[in-house]
Amino acid sequence: MRAILFDTETSAKENGEVIELSYCDVYCDGVDEFSGPNPISRGTITTLRFKPKGGISFGACAVHHILPADLDDAPPFDLELLPPADIYVGHNIDFDLKFFPNRTPVRTIDTLA
């Protein structure tokens, strides 16, 4: 089983664009806790930044501290960059997943709940 732990930062709270995507793969061999050991391995942590088509709101900058100048050399956002997974884990995950309509997870875990 493959889980992706991920988070996005956006250019605005409403109608924003993804300006940062961070994720980490977590793999499980599929053995559950009642059947025996459940080895879990962690993959690489990846952080990618993107230049928005519009600007970055002051409120968004205050939250994530990413300034427009930090994105001058960044490529545009590509929704294909979030890897496919069996489970997606994130904080306020419904907000983050709306930027990746091509990813339909089997399950999600929201740390906001």
What is the predicted role of each segment?
Residues M1-T111:
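Conserved non-catalytic scaffold segment of RNase H-like nuclease domains
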